[in-house]
Amino acid sequence: MKLSDIKNGNLSAEWAEKGYELPKFDVEAVKAKTHAEPTWVHFGAGNIFRAFPAAILNEALNSGKYDRGVIVAESFDYEIIDKAYQPYDNLSLRVCLKSTGDIEKKVIASVTESLKADYSFGEDW
């Protein structure tokens, strides 16, 4: 199982069967609308961003209360873009261990684009 399979609709049933909450919105449509009409660029692509602000936006997209994702830009540690975002189509896996011992597993798909905030990376600038 690979995160990128979810985006293509492959193995979605297998992920759900194993207890992963998948995006309930059309990831590609949100990506296209965000690219055409961006509303949020977030500077700082670390774990706190992925686990909290991106997860909250993911819930808003799942509920239909919002229709665009977030573009994340990293201005310090560019390796996170190259190793944690782009190889996985900007998808993340959020895993929370609850006080009851339950494990909550969610695929976060609200990040639609990941960029290096540095003019030396012309394609991102």
Task: Tell me what each language-model feature is.
Residues 1-125:
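Non-transmembrane, aqueous-exposed alpha-helical and coiled segments at domain scale
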